[in-house]
Amino acid sequence: MSKIYVIGVGTGSKDCLTLKAVEVLQKLDVLYCPTSKSDNESIAFSIAKDFLKDDIEVKNRHFPMIRDREKIKGIFKEMADEMKNDALSGKNVGFVTIGDPMIYSTFIYVLENLKDNIEVKTISGIPSFVDVASKMNFPLAFDDMPFIVIPSIADMEKIEEYIVEFDAIVLMKAYKNYGEIVELIKKYKLENNTLVVSNSSRENEKIIVGKDIYTDENCEYLTTIIINKRWKL
């Protein structure tokens, strides 16, 4: 039976790939790779490439960084149709994404157009916030604590509400309004309960803790902020 594989390649290092991800990558005939710019190499591909067959067909696909879902719906449908046709022709088809495919992944929008038409097999990957929390021995949640994961493109008033309401907060892709978020951390005196990581597990990884978060001006696209009010660094 034809199926499409979506593979989470984890945080940024090939060492963080799961054995299952490697097994699937090694058997693919066609691999779709999302890029944020038309001339950029996919970050996910750079992690996965050492495990691919020599004769694999790689299809880089540019996804414009816009929030108007109606405007880009046609792009996702076109890609879903192309992937489905490749799979129905007998090829092993894959799509790679950083982190986990079901957490703020581009593939989710493609999945909307595939889920009723063909089997999709998802291979989980390690999200950046899990990787860095473990690396720094910084608990995400314990006892009766709920924790919330939110995109930093959310309204700042909403982000402040979450910071007040929850004991543990993960803010994904904090590059856009990093300064405003840092001001909230300062306002609620949470600098010693906050961890900032950019480019987790990559060569240019940067981890910032404590009051150093106030002096960092060059926030990268792949920046995650973790706050735990019950745990001090």
Where do the PLM segments sit?
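A contiguous loop/helix-start segment that scaffolds small-molecule binding in enzyme catalytic cores
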Residues: I4-V6, I163-L233
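A polyampholytic, Gly/Pro-enriched intrinsically disordered region
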Residues: E78-D86, L140-P151, I213-T224
